[in-house]
Structures are given as C-alpha cells and as structure tokens.
Swiss-Prot record:
SUPFAM superfamilies: DNA repair protein MutS, domain I (SSF55271), DNA repair protein MutS, domain II (SSF53150), DNA repair protein MutS, domain III (SSF48334), P-loop containing nucleoside triphosphate hydrolases (SSF52540). This is DNA mismatch repair protein MutS. SMART domains: MUTSac, MUTSd. The keyword ATP-binding applies.
C-alpha cells in the first residue's frame, strides 16, 4: 500500500495527497508532518518496513473543512479515492486521484463567499507586448476573455478580477512569478498546453482571435487536468474589451473605496456595501461586476436607468419582486454542482423551490409599464418540465447523504415501491411479533430491537428472565441489565427486510443519479434564467436604494457639462444620516474644466472630490445618484490621488507614490476623463512641491483638458486663476466663533483665506501648552513674512526620473527651466505664469526666525502623555476623513 501511495504521490509533488483508507483520508511522510502542523491534528506513525512512516488523517465525512483550510492557505489537495470494491479486490485496492483541488478551483464549502466570484485566471504574454487573459469561476461556469495592450493594462485587469490562482507557462521568469504572487496574493500554477480541442467548441467555438483562443486553451487544459471530468456547465466565453468600460486603476478604486475601505480593507463602508440591497447571491455577484466595470455606452446606461426608474416608482411591485427573490437559491452554483456530479437531493429541492418562484416573477415584471420588461420576461424561463420531474421524484425533506435512502418519493418507480412494501410489511410483522410475545410471556417490557451487528433481536430485562419459557428463544447476547434472544422465524424475516432495504437504497441511489443526469439537460436554460434573475435583483437593489435615499436620475451631456446640485457623498450620508449631511454643488463646463480647491483640513475637500467621482460611477453603472439634480458627461476614465498609502515594502515613499500616480494620469487621461488630485506635492519640500503642483495643473489645463478637481494647501497656486482661463478657485468654508473654528462643510467660489491648522490641532486635544507655543511661533513667522525663505532642500530628481514623469515626448520635468519653456511655448500666458509664485498673496514663512527662548513648559499630565502616545501611533495617511474625525473625538474624550 505504501508503494502505491509513493507512486501516486510522485505524480502530484506540489499537492497534499489525501489517500483514502476506509473511512479516513490518510497523509504520509512530509505531507503528514506539514498537514499536522497546518491543520493542528495529531501526527502519528505506522510501520513502513525499515522505519516508521509519519502519518496523520482526517475522517472522510468531515474532510471538506480540512481541505478548505489548506486551500485557504494557498495549498493544493489531490483527492485519491478507492475506485474498486475492497470486498472484490485482489491484493491492494486500486486507487486513483479523482480531483485536484486548488485555490482557484474550489467548488463548495465556506471557502466560497456567497456574493463574490471565485476566479481562476490564465495569463498568456505575446511577443508584441500584448497579454491574453482568460478567467473562469468554476462554481458558476462563467468564462471571460480579453486581450490587453500592455503589462500595465494587464496588471490593472488582474486586480479587478481578483483571481485566487493565476496560471502561467512553466518558462515564465522567476521574478515575474514572484511579482504575481506578491502583488495579487494569488497562488501561481503552470500549464503549457495551448492546443485546441473540439470538445471546447461550446465554450470558445465562437472566438475568432487566435490570441484569445490560446489564452482560453491554457485555462481549459488546466481545468481538465485538475478536475478530471467533463465540465458541461462552462458557459460560452464572454469576450470584452476594457476600452468599452470606464477605466479605473486599482489605486483609484481603493481611493474611492468602491468595494473595500482604505483603512480596514473590508466591505463595510464601501460603495458596494451601500448599494447592495440584492437578495440573491447571483445578484450580489453581478452588482460587484457592474461596479468593477461602469459602462460608457449611453444606450445601455439609459436602458438600466429606465428599469430603475420604473421600479423606483412601483413600490408594491418592487416589494413583490423582493419577496419572490428571497425564495430563489444560488441557481448558478447549484447548476455547477449538478454538472460536477456532487449535487445532493437537497440541492435539487433548492433548485425546484427556486423555479417555483419564476412564474410570479414573470407576472410582476410583465406588468411593469416598460418595453424592456418583455425582453426580460423571455429570459425568465420557468423550466416547467424540470419542475414536474423534481416534484414527482425527490422527497421534500431528503437527507444530506445520497446513499442512505429516503430520497425518492413513493409512486415514482414501481420496483422501488415493491422493495419498500416488502420492508414496511416486514417491519409491521416485527411490531406484531413484539405484541404477540409480550402477551405470550406476560413480560410488558419485552421489546424487539435492531442494531447493525446482531440484526433484529428480542430483549428481556434480567428481572423478567424467569418468565421466559424454556426453549422458546435462542440466547444471543448478555448485557449488564438484560439478555438478547433470537428465533429462526425472526432471522428469516430479518433477511427479507434487510434485503429489501438494501436493494431499496441501492435503487434509490441509481434513480437519483439518473434524475441528476436529466437535470444536466437543462443547464443552458438554467444559466440563462440565473443571469436574468441576477440582473433583475441588481436593478431592484438600485431602485430600493434610490427610493430610500432620495436619489435622482442622472442626465447625460454631450457638451462635456457637469452640473451637480445638492450633491452628497452616498456612504458618508448613510453613516451620518441625511439630516447631518451638508450637500454641495459642482458646476463645470468647457470654460471651467478645473477646480482648484483650498481650505482647512477636515473641512470636506476630499469628501467633496470623492462624491463627484462616486456620482459619475453610480450614474454609469445605471443607478440613480445622490443629488437634487445631476447632468454629467460620460467619463472614459477616472484617476485619483487622494491620501497616501506608502508602499514602504517596495521602497516607495509618499512622494514616489504621488509621482507614479500623477504620471499614470497624465500619460493616459483624455479630455473625457475625470482627474482627482488631493494635495499633490506634499511629499517633498515646500517650494519643490509647489512648483510640481503648478506644473501639473498647467499641463493638464493646456494639454489634456480633462475635468479636474485639484485640492491644495499651497494658497499661492490660487493666483493661477488669472493665467489659466479654464481654472476656477473654490474653497471649503470655515468660520471662527469665539476663538473656535467651525467647519461648515460647504464648497464656495473663490480661494480660502486661512488654513486653521492650529485650530485643528486644538480640536485633536493636543496639550494647551503645545497649542500656545504653536500660536507664538506662528506670530513670529507672520512678522517675518517679508524675509526670504531659507533653502528647504532640493527636489528628489531621482524619484521623478524613476516615476517617469514626462509632459511631452521625452521632455523631462525641470522646474528650474520651466519659466523659460513657458515663455517659448505660450508667449501670451508666459509672462502671467512666470510671476505666479513671486506675486502670490501668501509667501512661505521661514521656520527658523530668531525667536526668543521658549518659556519652560509645565510637565505633561498622564492623560496628556497617553494622548500624545496615541497620536504618534495614528497613520493619518491611511485614514478616511470620517475615521480621522472619530479618532479626534476619542482623543478629545481621553483628555477631558
């Protein structure tokens, strides 16, 4: 047996081999040592000839949980089953690996999140620098293909897909493989076969492009090799181009917190969390897919909006749909289990219950006053023949196991009915025997029982043994308090009963497998139905949210006009409540392309910028938007740089991250894009940062023309409004009352007059002595406002070069010669721009004036020390404004 194990293990060196021995899966040698550690189970050993062989095992019936633990940690598990009956085997029972479970091929269990896809991806690079990406969710049968023009585009798409496992060729470079593992947190596997098979025509027969066919073939070969069975539920591959959707890189999605928050990386607090009023798992998955890829096709956007508007105003119909959808199980994954051959009777009951909801869904949708409703009704296929089959055949409450009987209804199969009658008649005879023997012996406690070891028996308690007539029974077993007996007649009836039950169970299993095979014929229809239900669920979710929060239908402008009246940040509004949220307007057109936003910290600049972007995203996925009125252009891309999440592990500082993200936006943005830049340049010295910020603003203004919201603390930059005709100043309002700053969270035209930095520090609860010292320093600095600023360090040219920030052709960003370039390229505006920094109303103040010695500060209290320690631990660069405000309240409470 060990030789058999070693032979099979050699074929799967990178996987844990779960080797079936009776009712256990056993692991041996290094697999056992490592599995015992990872699963925290007992490591033992068995005789292996010259030495003891390390061994551990898990029960067959509970193996799924252990397998999921290993898969979750990135391992693979090969399932090796006994493929012949041990009773008839000659020598060692024949065993084979029947499935290789990998991080990307999980089909069931807790490892599958209900409202998330579980993707396996195959990435194929080509000599011309393009990449073919094929990915599939084995649990649902979805397959998608796309061709990407560069590694940067491929990297962004891989992030959007979120694959658990990535398949590449075996000759892929080690450095690239390591980057895939580290960058995406995915397992990496290998497959070299990209040849095509006729059996895949149903999946990729319609794909004409050779590169996509190769990428798909790599994926499909890996699936066939690991799953070792037909995959009839794989759907025809969906081909798409990333240019047909709004583009957002992973940084932009994270900054906007579309599907997860910056701080916790969790779902709660994200836009997905807000929008998800879906009531089916299929709808939840589709919602995330829509959010990952907002549309740019106005006709399709309007189609969705028409549906949402109708459902929003049809309250009772919407509630009826929600009630019916709650009765729909995860049809996509049920179909996957049916195709896989591991669906049980309960799965088929869930499928039947889901189908029983479809007629009511069709009726409700068909009654909606909307032309598109008829098209959706056509896809809501009730599969009446399948419902009839399942209604006639499967018990309403079957057991979990498919090999213990009680699966099939009476009347479905005549032979099964005969077996059951024999078993039931036999059991009735047993009951009659018990009554007869009680009367004959006078022993009221006499009973006829059954166990698997002895079969049927007559049990008499010890006090009643004298009442048993001599020779009436044959003694079989002595217990502490009773004796068990048998009779020839009882054993004869037992044989008849057990034979009938055994044959009944065997026949039930055969009938169930045949029924499951019949269900497979409906897979394409069921998958079409599942997609229709998912779409209906997402649309009703949008309508429910839009109705609850008073969202409005967006209008779209072909003149690049953006008008948002009474706009709100949807997530912040939900958290704070509509009564506490301060709405704001935003107006942009061809003459007002850029908004330069100034104002103090915590006044709402970042929230304002985010809400504009989120309004655009929501509109382009077909949802109503949080505003009183919204007119929007259709954006092809959204770029953001909000906050700073330093990639220290990659040696990238805040400044480097700023420059990389600025470069990405500048290189790819068009006049139809939306750019959000929050305090660009703060990662380096003051003048360098200011110069960079001005240069970036000018470049976007002159060469790109994208709608841009640019927030800054460099008040000097507000003078750019005089030289850049399409730039306008706006500011976040704040006022002082009784020496305290009050943030109004209102955006108004014009530049801000103050930053209120010391007021913010005071709100944070910093020690009073520290605040007074800051005010003294500020007063001295203001006195020295006319003095020339000391050198504050040179710009990090190395970081700029590494970031590859270039504005035109190979022209490098050279702040020292910027004025000369402006004079040469734009003589009409050059003179105005050359003096922006010199003419700015707010000169930078020296941090090192000749100050008098500071007074001796009183010692800090224990509370103040604790608050300071807590303040030092805060990573402000990874906090949202709301989280920062909450932290300030905590510190303030600590100091009171």
């Amino acid at each position: 047996m060990i030789q058999q194990y070693l032979h099979i293990k050699a074929q799967y060196p990178d996987a844990f081999l779960f080797f079936r021995l009776g009712d256990f899966y056993e692991l041996f040698f290094d697999d056992a040592i490592k599995a015992a550690q990872e699963l925290e189970i007992t490591l033992t050993s068995r005789d292996g000839g010259d030495e003891r062989v390390p061994m551990c095992g898990v029960p067959y019936h509970s193996a799924q949980g252990y397998i999921e633990q290993l898969i979750e940690k990135g391992y693979k598990v090969a399932i090796c089953e006994q493929v012949e009956d041990p009773k008839t085997a000659k020598g060692v029972v024949r065993r084979e690996v029947v499935q290789l479970i990998t991080p990307g091929t999980l089909m069931e269990g807790k490892g599958l999140t209900e409202k998330e896809n579980h993707y396996l991806a195959a990435l194929t690079p080509f000599a011309d620098g393009t990449y073919g990406l094929a990915y599939a969710d084995l649990s649902t049968g979805e397959v998608r293909l796309t061709l990407l023009s560069s590694w940067e585009e491929a990297a962004n798409e891989l992030h959007a897909v979120g694959a658990r496992e990535i398949i590449v060729a075996t000759d892929s470079g080690e450095e690239w493989v390591r980057e895939l593992k580290e960058r995406y947190g995915a397992a990496v596997s290998y497959e070299d076969d990209t040849s095509l098979c006729d059996e895949w025509n149903g999946v990729i027969g319609h794909v004409a492009q050779e590169k996509l066919r190769q990428a798909a073939a790599r994926l499909l070969h890996y699936l066939v090799r690991t799953q070792k069975r037909r995959l009839d539920h794989l759907q025809p591959a969906e081909l798409y181009q990333v240019d047909h959707y709004m583009k957002m890189d992973r940084h932009s999605k994270l900054h906007l917190e579309l599907v997860e928050t910056v701080r916790s990386k969790g779902r709660k607090g994200s836009l997905l969390w807000l929008l998800d009023e879906t009531v089916t798992a299929m709808g939840g998955r589709l919602l995330k897919q829509w959010l990952d890829r907002p549309l740019i096709d106005r006709r399709e956007i309007e189609r969705r909006l028409d549906f949402v508007e109708t459902l929003k105003t049809s309250y009772f119909e919407r509630q009826e749909l929600r009630d019916r959808l709650r009765g729909v199980y995860d049809i996509e994954r049920l179909v996957g289990r049916v195709s896989y051959g591991n669906a049980n009777a309960r799965d088929l009951v869930q499928l039947k219950k889901s189908l029983l909801q479809v007629p009511a869904l069709r009726q409700t949708v068909g009654a909606l006053p909307l032309a598109e409703a008829d098209k959706l009704c056509e896809r809501l296929d009730p599969c009446e023949e399948l419902v009839d089959l399942l209604e006639r055949s499967i018990q309403e409450q079957p057991p979990l196991s498919v090999k213990e009987g009680n699966l099939i209804k009476d009347g479905y199969d005549k032979q099964l009915d005969r077996y059951r009658d024999a078993s039931r008649n036999g059991k009735a005879w047993i009951a009659e025997l018990e009554a007869k023997e009680r009367e004959a012996t006078g022993i009221k406690s006499l009973k006829v029982g059954y166990n698997r070891v002895f079969g049927y028996y007559i049990e008499v308690t010890k006090p009643n043994l004298p009442l048993v007539p001599e020779g009436r029974y044959e003694r079989k077993q002595t217990l502490a308090n009773a004796e068990r007996f048998i009779t020839p007649e009882l054993k004869e009836k037992e044989a008849l009963i057990l034979e009938a039950e055994e044959k009944s169970i065997e026949l039930e299993y055969e009938l169930f497998v045949a029924i499951r095979e019949q269900v497979k014929q409906y897979i394409p229809r069921l998958q079409t139905l599942a997609k229709a239900i998912a779409e209906l669920d997402v649309l009703q979710s949008f309508a429910t949210i839009s109705d609850e929060y008073r969202y409005v239908r967006p209008q779209f402008s072909t003149e690049r006009v953006l008008v948002i009246q009474g706009g709100r940040h949807p997530v912040v509004e939900k958290v704070l409540g509509a009564q506490m949220y301060v709405p704001n307007d935003c107006y942009m057109n061809r003459e007002r392309e850029m908004l330069l936003i100034t104002g103090p910290n915590m006044a709402g600049k970042s929230t304002y910028m985010r809400q504009v972007a989120l309004t655009a995203v929501m509109a382009q996925i077909g949802c109503f938007v949080p505003a009183e009125r919204a007119v929007l252009p259709i954006f092809d891309q959204v770029f953001t740089r909000i906050g700073a999440a330093d990639d220290l592990s990659a040696g990238q500082s805040t400044f480097m991250v700023e420059m990389l993200e600025a470069r990405h936006a500048i290189a790819h943005a068009t006049q139809n894009s939306l750019i959000l830049f929050d305090e660009i340049g703060r990662g380096t010295s003051t003048y360098d940062g200011m110069a960079l910020a001005q240069a970036i603003i000018e470049y976007i203004h002159d060469h790109i023309g994208a709608k841009t919201l640019f927030s800054t603390h460099y008040h000097e930059l507000t003078a750019l409004e005089r030289s850049l005709p399409r730039l306008s100043n706006v500011h976040a309002r704040a006022i002082e009352e009784n020496g305290k700053v009050v943030f109004l969270h209102q955006i108004a035209d014009g530049p801000a007059d103050k930053s209120y930095g010391i007021h913010v520090a005071e709100l944070a609860g910093l020690p009073a002595s520290l605040i007074e010292r800051a005010r003294a320093i500020l007063a001295e600095l203001e006195k020295a406002a006319g003095k020339q600023e000391a050198a504050a360090g040179r710009m990090d040219d190395g970081a700029l070069a590494e970031a590859g920030l270039a504005f035109q052709g190979n022209e490098a960003l050279d702040v020292g010669s910027k004025v000369e370039r402006e004079k040469a390229s734009r003589p009409s505006a050059g003179a105005a721009r050359e003096g922006v920094l010199a003419e700015a109303a707010f000169e930078q103040l020296s941090m090192f004036p000749d100050l008098a010695p500071a007074p001796v500060e009183p010692p800090l209290s224990s509370k103040e020390k604790k608050a300071l320690a807590a303040l030092k631990e805060i990573n402000l660069l990874e906090m949202t404004p709301l989280e920062a405000l909450n932290k300030l309240y905590e510190l303030q409470k600590l100091l009171k």
